[in-house]
């Protein structure tokens, strides 16, 4: 049975039917508690975590006759071993996969000693979002991003908002077949300035993400990646050639949290953040702050010191509010005071741009000049951007340079 797709970001939830039509339903505002009863009332089936070694775009029908092939595409970033074994090198798991088997992400399959991507061009969800929803606050404020996702992930986060995408096998989801050129055409048609690879983990569809970004550039549309940062150096360096920005979920400073709550490791994510800095790719960090699990002030301090020491004070950091979801429905919503305290800790240690997220209307969602303290990018409810007091990447009040991607 094919599954419904749930796309969750802050206040919006989109329920995508597994058939050819789609519908959207709106959850109560995040200021209200979302009960399990309300969640189940949306008609979304549950998905189990299994770890083993046509939609509409901006109101337009997305055609599947895009010239894209239904034949699985050979993966990049792997090596052939003896006895028809292969080793995938797209992420730090470096899965060794036997003939007929799949890697941890369940999107890469060994067929007779050749590794294939099962999700190349298989778009399981697409939507047009404000770039602030990703969130990117220093990338083309107020712009739109044509957002795409496939099945699969190389983590199994217990709090995943989009678990029905990330924890599903490709064959369990209804998807449409799109070529990179078709993705670009849909981005243009929707009025989007960007293509965003998001919702699930783009690392598992690195080949498609790269090709979409390259095709987009040829038409003047740039791409951004929304990722957990669990990616090896070679694919990251390849992506850096064609993307405008990369958002990393800095899920915690605790190694234990990574191991027990995400199923991954912390240090490879830290290496990705440092590597992005060296590659010159604009990077923003997001910390989903979960009560009792990663809201320890000592960890905030360690995170702040690491950021200052390794990537510097200019990287934006977003502390976003957790809402009970997936396997962590027993936990409460994050108190706003916790997010504010985290923001204070990082700013006290010299990080210039620290944001409070998932709290619509909070002043901590706006951008303030580190020179004069004035509000230079005003943000309100629903990802809206108000007045922008900047000129050519500088503060309109005092002239100090504000780091970011302000034009392309």
Which residues are covered by each model-predicted region?
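N-terminal [4Fe-4S]-dependent radical SAM core
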Residues: 16, 21-30, 59-87, 93-149, ...
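N-terminal secretory signal peptides and thylakoid transit peptides that target proteins
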Residues: 22-47
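Short cysteine-rich clusters marking metal-coordination/redox-active sites
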Residues: 88, 157, 369, 395-398
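Conserved Radical SAM active-site core
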Residues: 110-245
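Conserved radical SAM core fold
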Residues: 166-167, 202-204, 229-236, 246-263, ...
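Conserved glycine-rich "GG(E/T)P / GGGxP" loop and the immediately following alpha-helix
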Residues: 188-215, 257-270, 287-302, 308
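Conserved C-terminal portion of the radical SAM core fold
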Residues: 267-328, 339-355
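Short linker/helix segments within small regulatory modules
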Residues: 382-390
